[in-house]
Amino acid sequence: MSHESKGPSKAPEFVAALKGAGFDFFCGVPCSLLKGLVSLLDHDESAHYISATREDSALGMAAGAYLGGKRPMVLMQNSGLGVSVNALASLSTMYDLPALLVISWRGEPSLNDAPEHILMGQIMLPILDLLKIPYRVLSPGTPVEPEVAWAKKEMLATKKPVALVAKAGVLE
């Protein structure tokens, strides 16, 4: 299993972009590929990060936060996307409850990852397509601020979830 770092983590820049775009509710289920992001949010008292036990529970929290006037972000490993399919299809999407999904890409086809991540790594983007969730992929060389701005604009325009998929090394 290999998760080679491809330069410094963009987690600090990402958190600044999220806050600058008005995201003010942060929850999710941690993943090692998101450890830099989780650590920053967890130690930032103004972020009020809530660690959930399941990804579908985090989506429920995000729905409530949105209804309460917040702009939510939910983080998860891509295996958590599988756990979240029903909540995304029958709650978030159906009832126009937007959230930014920040999803780590375990089992990315070009990487040597643990065997349990390989299939989900192959089918994650098609699942997002089937759910009609627009997404962008964050690579180590990708500037994050324009991607966060795109996500905010898309969420506000559609009132639906959108996703930023983080490759290994981006938010570690």
Map each language-model feature to its residues.
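Thiamine diphosphate
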Residues: 1-172
